[in-house]
Amino acid sequence: MKQRLLVMNGQKLLQTEHAGEWKVDKVEKAGTIRPGIYNLYLAAPADQATEHVGVVLHADSQFVYQQVGKTFIRHDRTRFDQVPTLGAHVSIRYQHDQAMVAAATLKVGRKLSH
């Protein structure tokens, strides 16, 4: 089953593909999630040895989806004590098989040119 998020006009639409057509399953306020099309079905399972820094896009009964750069990561929801806030820019790492969530620090810098 393919799922995607369509974010536009302040709304977040969860869509599922049925027989080649996208059907809307759920509509919610987008909050701080940027407008765009997010193909959740392309999400790779989280690597527990890596720290994942990015925006939390969606959470369902099984997974928490996070955008890391241009890729999507899915975290097993049962590994969280509390699901992170949707739209939040967070760092997720694993310790003793549990997901640890912390506010991500944005890296701001400038390149020097000669």
Which residues does each PLM region occupy?
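A general sequence property marking short-to-moderate contiguous segments
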Residues: 7-43
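Short, flexible beta-strand-to-coil junctions
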Residues: 57-63, 67-72
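Hydrophobic residues embedded in beta-strands of well-ordered beta-sheets
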Residues: 12-13, 63-64, 99-101
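Beta-strand/loop nucleic-acid-binding surfaces
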Residues: 69-86
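Non-Sec secretion/translocation targeting segments of pathogen effectors
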Residues: 65-66, 106-114
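Short, exposed beta-strand/loop patches in secreted or surface proteins that constitute
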Residues: 5-6, 54-58, 82
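Structural detector for short beta-strands of small beta-barrel domains
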Residues: 31-61, 89-94
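Flexible glycine-rich surface loops and low-complexity tracts that mediate binding to linear polymers
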Residues: 4, 9, 84-105
